[in-house]
């Protein structure tokens, strides 16, 4: 290399920065959420909810996979797969005619429904989500318990949830009617005030008329008095004139 020529090798500092950006800034892991436990009665259906959080936008290549491990079993089998916008039900196992896709990737929902539950469905279901390029993360598991009847504990929880929702609805309705009652009451008071003002305007001309009615006799009396005074003056003047003529 000739003296004074610029070096073509990268700066050691720049190389270190590039290395640290690649090593120390990995993509955030995807996070999958499911219920811990779900309960169902024999012959009924149950929804296995699955949602996720990802640092990336929902990809067209997003995929959901459900696996099932029977109660007491050691191996898990794939029972459902969603990819390229299409759901696929695996032919292996007893769920092939009982699974229904109810999820929506745009809402980050990968839920499925299992129909016609049976005791043999007891076990653990695993939801796995891949949202390229965000594909690193842990799966989430939900345990299904099938009974002849839904357990009381589950019924109590469900009843509490329904009761809470109904309570909120009733509270909103009560608040609506209270606000409406106050508004109607205020409108009625305003209407009464406007009516009173209108009546006051109508009564004012009547008061003026009554005043004029009281003033009219007084005016007539004053007019009669002036006329009588004038007549008396004229009569007196006429009498004086006649008396002067008599003296002459």
From Swiss-Prot:
Membrane topology: Single-pass type I membrane protein
Residues exposed to the Extracellular side: 30-153
Assembly description: Homodimer and homotetramer.
Subcellular location: Cell membrane
Protein name: Myelin protein P0
PROSITE patterns named in the record: IG_LIKE, MYELIN_P0
Purpose: Is an adhesion molecule necessary for normal myelination in the peripheral nervous system. It mediates adhesion between adjacent myelin wraps and ultimately drives myelin compaction.
Gene transcribed to yield this protein: MPZ
Superkingdom classification of source: Eukaryota
């Amino acid at each position: 290399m000739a003296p004074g020529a610029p070096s073509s090798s990268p700066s050691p500092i720049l190389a270190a920065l590039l290395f640290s950006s690649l090593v120390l800034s990995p993509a955030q892991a995807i996070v999958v959420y499911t219920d811990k436990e779900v309960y169902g009665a024999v012959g009924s259906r149950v929804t296995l909810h699955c949602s996720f959080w990802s640092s990336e936008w929902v990809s067209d290549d997003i995929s959901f996979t459900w696996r099932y491990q029977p109660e007491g079993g050691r191996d898990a089998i794939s029972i459902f797969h969603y990819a390229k916008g299409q759901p696929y039900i695996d032919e292996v196992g007893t769920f092939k005619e009982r699974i229904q896709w109810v999820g929506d990737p745009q809402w980050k929902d990968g839920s499925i429904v299992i129909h016609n539950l049976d005791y043999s469905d007891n076990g653990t279901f695993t939801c796995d989500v891949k949202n390229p390029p965000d594909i690193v993360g842990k799966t989430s598991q939900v345990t299904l318990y099938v009974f002849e009847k839904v357990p009381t504990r589950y019924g109590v929880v469900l009843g509490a949830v329904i009761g809470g929702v109904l309570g909120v609805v009733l509270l909103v309705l009560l608040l609506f009617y209270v606000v409406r009652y106050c508004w109607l009451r205020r409108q009625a008071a305003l209407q009464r005030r406007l009516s009173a003002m209108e009546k006051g305007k109508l009564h004012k001309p009547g008061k003026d008329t009554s005043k004029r009615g009281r003033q009219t006799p007084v005016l007539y009396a004053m007019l009669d008095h002036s006329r009588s005074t004038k007549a008396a003056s004229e009569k007196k003047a006429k009498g004086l004139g006649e008396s002067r003529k008599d003296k002459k």
